[in-house]
Amino acid sequence: MTLSEKIVDYVISLNKKEIPEMVYLKAQEHFQDTVACIMAGAGKEAIRLAVDYCVETTGSNASSVIGYKDVKLNSGNAAMVNAMAAHICDYDDMSMELNGHSSTVLVPTVLAVGEEMQCSGTEILDAYITGIQINSVLGRLVANTKIDPGWNLTSLVGIFGATIAAGILYKPVSYTHLRAHE
């Protein structure tokens, strides 16, 4: 069994009802903090340029860009722009297990896909928590790996948690999601 298959099996086996209430409360807190970071970064010139580029090249779609009332992009571009805005002021959360910024990658992803798929708030939060779990597990696995300057675990590991979280919201979670990161 490949590592990707093991990760998907782990995700499928998770029972959200076993997640302690404190985890949900902390997840809501980190989620709200990340949305605040996105709002703080939304007006920065680099974000405006990214929004303009995405609108010009892909047009309107189903997912909102926070801070831009009338702008909707495809879920991938909305997640990208919102993630850029979340990190641009560098106030985003820090995961000690990942040694990176999980929420910066996950919140924009689950918001964009959740809006596209018309998911409930609970479904979005569950996908976010699962993404955090995946990033934390993978972060611990590579914790002692030497990372070259210019790279960090947010970009190297965060894609896996974000892919899993998006896959959960696109439903159903299965081995078909394995190809999403390839």
Region annotations inferred by a language model:
Residues 1-99:
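Terminal-appendage/accessory-domain detector
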Residues 34-41, 102-122, 160-171:
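Alpha-helical support elements that line or immediately flank enzyme active sites
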Residues 59-62, 134-142:
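Secretory-pathway/luminal and periplasmic proteins that interact with or process carbohydrate-rich
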Residues 86-95, 138-149:
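Glycine/charged-rich beta-loop-alpha catalytic/anionic-binding loops adjacent to active sites
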Residues 98-103, 125-128, 146-159:
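Active-site nucleophile and cofactor-binding loops and adjacent substrate-binding regions
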Residues 113, 128-138:
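Acidic, glycine-rich active-site loops and adjacent beta-strand->loop/helix elements
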Residues 176-182:
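Conserved small/polar residues in nucleotide/adenosyl-binding loops
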